[in-house]
């Protein structure tokens, strides 16, 4: 699918709450200039759950047009409704997405058997590579190792984004999955240990404002240069902590504003950071000296 750092793109909005496609294109070009290896549209960071179907399609079409095949474009198509997920994933395939990322059904809190049935139904309905997305802190349900192994047998299910935060689970997962099945880290503070376990990259929030640094970290790990990787990961930790000091994507949108990308406020029910939180984020960003170059 890809190796290295992929960015879970933030979605820019105007002051009146509409999509800001000019800023979105600018964000994409900055990512590509920094050698980011993939782009995710309409995921958690992209506020996919508060986008209309028309907005999602517009963003995806824009990303596909701007990237022009330079890197894979992965569509965040997961919902907690199987029929809607199938329809959204079919739309992504029709528009030309390179893959679809499917979060576990949230709120419903289905069983492992239900997860197998849900993801299999989607995979059967589309001719598109599918990435499973495990983020139980946000969804209330986790994919077990056994379920992942079962789903990996489906030819269209080709990748797994692991964001449980459990390094032991990551080890069990990598041991159990077949060779060649792509696994990606989903937590910026765990890029080093997850890639040490064999993840072939990261789908990152951090890389929105810090694409070059995130890609440099991933490249060091792919090259087994753990001395460089430890330095980069360590130096980035205060920034990562600040970017997750509030619910994603609240801080990362503030960070993008700080570097000159007017991505606007998150959509309700999310709101901007508190003054104290924002001040801490900006202080941390200004203290960070960078590790690239």
From Swiss-Prot:
Disulfide bonds, paired cysteine numbers: none
Pathway listed: Amino-acid biosynthesis; L-lysine biosynthesis via DAP pathway; (S)-tetrahydrodipicolinate from L-aspartate: step 3/4
Keywords: Amino-acid biosynthesis, Cytoplasm, Diaminopimelate biosynthesis, Lyase, Lysine biosynthesis, Schiff base
UniProt-listed Pfam families: DHDPS
GO cellular component: cytosol
Annotated GO biological process: diaminopimelate biosynthetic process; lysine biosynthetic process via diaminopimelate
Keyword Transferase recorded: no
HAMAP family per UniProt: DapA
Protein name as annotated: 4-hydroxy-tetrahydrodipicolinate synthase
Species, as recorded: Exiguobacterium sibiricum (strain DSM 17290 / CCUG 55495 / CIP 109462 / JCM 13490 / 255-15)
Source organism phylogeny: Bacteria, Bacillati, Bacillota, Bacilli, Bacillales
Gene: dapA
């Amino acid at each position: 699918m890809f190796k290295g750092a992929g960015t879970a793109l933030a979605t820019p909005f105007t002051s009146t709450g509409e999509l800001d496609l000019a800023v979105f294109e600018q964000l994409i070009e900055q990512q590509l200039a920094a050698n980011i290896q993939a782009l995710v549209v309409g995921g958690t960071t992209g506020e996919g759950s508060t986008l209309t179907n028309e907005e999602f399609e517009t963003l995806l079409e824009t990303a596909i047009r701007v990237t022009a095949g330079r890197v894979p474009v992965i569509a965040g198509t997961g919902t907690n409704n199987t029929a809607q997920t199938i329809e959204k994933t079919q739309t992504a395939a029709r528009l030309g997405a390179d893959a679809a990322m499917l979060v576990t059904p949230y709120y419903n809190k289905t069983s492992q058997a239900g997860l197998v049935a849900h993801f299999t139904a989607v995979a059967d309905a589309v001719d598109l590579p599918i990435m499973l997305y495990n983020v139980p802190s946000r969804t209330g349900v986790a994919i077990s190792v056994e379920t992942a192994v079962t789903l990996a047998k489906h030819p269209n299910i080709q990748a797994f984004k692991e964001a449980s935060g459990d390094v032991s689970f990551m080890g069990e997962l990598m041991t159990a999955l077949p060779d060649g099945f792509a696994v990606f880290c989903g937590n910026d503070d765990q890029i080093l240990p997850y890639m040490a376990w064999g993840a072939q990259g990261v789908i990152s929030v951090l890389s929105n404002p810090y694409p070059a640094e995130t890609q440099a970290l991933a490249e060091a790990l792919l090259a087994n240069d753990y001395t460089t990787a430890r330095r980069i990961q360590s130096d980035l930790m205060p920034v990562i902590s600040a970017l997750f000091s509030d619910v994603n994507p609240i801080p990362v949108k503030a960070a993008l504003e700080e570097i000159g990308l007017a991505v606007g406020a998150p959509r309700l029910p999310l709101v901007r950071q508190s003054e104290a939180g924002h001040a801490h984020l900006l202080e941390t960003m200004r203290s960070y000296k960078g590790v690239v170059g």
